[in-house]
From Swiss-Prot:
Keywords: Metal-binding, Ribonucleoprotein, Ribosomal protein, RNA-binding, rRNA-binding, Zinc. Part of the 30S ribosomal subunit. Contacts proteins S3 and S10. HAMAP family: Ribosomal_uS14_2_B (MF_01364_B). Belongs to the universal ribosomal protein uS14 family. Zinc-binding uS14 subfamily. The keyword Metal-binding applies. This is Small ribosomal subunit protein uS14B.
Amino acid sequence: MAKKALVNKAAGKPRFAVRAYTRCSKCGRPRAVYRKFGLCRICLREMAHAGELPGVQKSSW
């Protein structure tokens, strides 16, 4: 889990727009966040396997 202080810091509006960065909305992880879902790769995978993301399915070919 991410530190609560850093999650709160990222939630606020920065003084300069380039300082803004994405965090996972579920766990607060700052890296590997998919903008479309607002989730990190780990939470995205867990939720997709559990069927909690509509329209997302495991690919097979």
